């Protein structure tokens, strides 16, 4: 073997070792993650921003707001909102709907949910997240996710979106939202978000293992 071939061989070995080290480091961080308990999660919310106005941007072009914001058609139009997700849809909550915005260029999605710990909001996680994701794919879109106060139901659905479509852990999602708006889902919703977090973390770990096995197979 010539000196040039030796150098090339050593370089390839170094590159492979470096890739393996980085992969192990990333997998180690993921493997170390454990979904926190409800009290620990609530502490993350308490450490967040005290800011609580009618509406706040919590992710680029994604806003959490209250009933007053959703009912103010002039303000919505002036602010350039193109989508509204009502997490308190229904006659006894925020009774808007598609007809309320019929003469405006706004797409509407309603979730009929009660802000009760016993209410199963998790059945709406994926449909609501898909609506938000479709809206944000358009660079010209702005979406308002609201309930009555803009603290529990709407925040829960936004957190689920960030976890499902932005590959965030529940901790990451809470930190992202809480630094921009004072929110606090009820204990029941937190429990449902914890279950979603566990499912998504497990899926990501399985995907990483499969990718690692495929990469190892290509290198052999």
UniProtKB/Swiss-Prot annotation:
<dbReference type="GO" id="GO:0042593">
    <property type="term" value="P:glucose homeostasis"/>
</dbReference>
<keyword id="KW-0963">Cytoplasm</keyword>
<dbReference type="GO" id="GO:0070373">
    <property type="term" value="P:negative regulation of ERK1 and ERK2 cascade"/>
</dbReference>
<dbReference type="GO" id="GO:0004722">
    <property type="term" value="F:protein serine/threonine phosphatase activity"/>
</dbReference>
<dbReference type="GO" id="GO:0008138">
    <property type="term" value="F:protein tyrosine/serine/threonine phosphatase activity"/>
</dbReference>
<protein>
    <recommendedName>
        <fullName>Dual specificity phosphatase 29</fullName>
        <ecNumber>3.1.3.16</ecNumber>
        <ecNumber>3.1.3.48</ecNumber>
    </recommendedName>
</protein>
<dbReference type="InterPro" id="IPR000340">
    <property type="entry name" value="Dual-sp_phosphatase_cat-dom"/>
</dbReference>
<dbReference type="GO" id="GO:0042692">
    <property type="term" value="P:muscle cell differentiation"/>
</dbReference>
<feature type="binding site">
    <location>
        <begin position="146"/>
        <end position="153"/>
    </location>
    <ligand>
        <name>substrate</name>
    </ligand>
</feature>
<dbReference type="InterPro" id="IPR000387">
    <property type="entry name" value="Tyr_Pase_dom"/>
</dbReference>
<feature type="domain" description="Tyrosine-protein phosphatase">
    <location>
        <begin position="54"/>
        <end position="202"/>
    </location>
</feature>
<dbReference type="GO" id="GO:0042803">
    <property type="term" value="F:protein homodimerization activity"/>
</dbReference>
<dbReference type="InterPro" id="IPR029021">
    <property type="entry name" value="Prot-tyrosine_phosphatase-like"/>
</dbReference>
<keyword id="KW-0378">Hydrolase</keyword>
<dbReference type="GO" id="GO:0006470">
    <property type="term" value="P:protein dephosphorylation"/>
</dbReference>
<comment type="similarity">
    <text>Belongs to the protein-tyrosine phosphatase family. Non-receptor class dual specificity subfamily.</text>
</comment>
<dbReference type="GO" id="GO:0032991">
    <property type="term" value="C:protein-containing complex"/>
</dbReference>
<keyword id="KW-0904">Protein phosphatase</keyword>
<dbReference type="GO" id="GO:0043409">
    <property type="term" value="P:negative regulation of MAPK cascade"/>
</dbReference>
<dbReference type="InterPro" id="IPR020405">
    <property type="entry name" value="Atypical_DUSP_subfamA"/>
</dbReference>
<keyword id="KW-0539">Nucleus</keyword>
<comment type="function">
    <text>Dual specificity phosphatase able to dephosphorylate phosphotyrosine, phosphoserine and phosphothreonine residues within the same substrate, with a preference for phosphotyrosine as a substrate. Involved in the modulation of intracellular signaling cascades. In skeletal muscle regulates systemic glucose homeostasis by activating, AMPK, an energy sensor protein kinase. Affects MAP kinase signaling though modulation of the ERK1/2 cascade in skeletal muscle promoting muscle cell differentiation, development and atrophy.</text>
</comment>
<dbReference type="Pfam" id="PF00782">
    <property type="entry name" value="DSPc"/>
</dbReference>
<dbReference type="GO" id="GO:0004725">
    <property type="term" value="F:protein tyrosine phosphatase activity"/>
</dbReference>
<dbReference type="GO" id="GO:0005737">
    <property type="term" value="C:cytoplasm"/>
</dbReference>
<dbReference type="InterPro" id="IPR016130">
    <property type="entry name" value="Tyr_Pase_AS"/>
</dbReference>
<comment type="subunit">
    <text>Homodimer. Interacts with PRKAA2.</text>
</comment>
<feature type="active site" description="Phosphocysteine intermediate">
    <location>
        <position position="147"/>
    </location>
</feature>
<dbReference type="GO" id="GO:0005634">
    <property type="term" value="C:nucleus"/>
</dbReference>
<dbReference type="InterPro" id="IPR020422">
    <property type="entry name" value="TYR_PHOSPHATASE_DUAL_dom"/>
</dbReference>
<dbReference type="GO" id="GO:0033549">
    <property type="term" value="F:MAP kinase phosphatase activity"/>
</dbReference>
């Amino acid at each position: 073997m010539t000196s040039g071939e030796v150098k090339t061989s050593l370089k390839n070995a170094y590159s492979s070792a470096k890739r393996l080290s980085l992969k192990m480091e990333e997998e180690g961080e993921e493997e170390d993650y454990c979904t926190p308990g409800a009290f620990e999660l609530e502490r993350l919310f308490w450490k967040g921003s005290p800011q609580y106005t009618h509406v706040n941007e919590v992710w680029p072009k994604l806003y959490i707001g209250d009933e007053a914001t959703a009912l103010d058609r002039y303000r919505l139009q002036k602010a350039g909102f193109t989508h509204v997700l009502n997490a308190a849809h229904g006659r006894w909550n925020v009774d808007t709907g598609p007809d309320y915005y019929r003469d405006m260029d706004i797409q509407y999605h309603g979730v009929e949910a009660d802000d009760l710990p016993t209410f199963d909001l998790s059945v709406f996680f994926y449909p609501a997240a898909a609506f938000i994701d479709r809206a944000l794919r358009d660079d010209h879109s702005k979406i308002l996710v609201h309930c009555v106060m803009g603290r529990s139901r709407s925040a829960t659905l936004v957190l689920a979106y960030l976890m499902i479509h932005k590959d965030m852990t529940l901790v990451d999602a809470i930190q992202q939202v809480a630094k921009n708006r004072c929110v606090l889902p009820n204990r029941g919703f937190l429990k449902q978000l914890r279950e979603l977090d566990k499912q998504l973390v497990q899926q990501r770990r399985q995907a990483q293992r499969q990718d690692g096995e495929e990469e190892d197979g290509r290198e052999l």
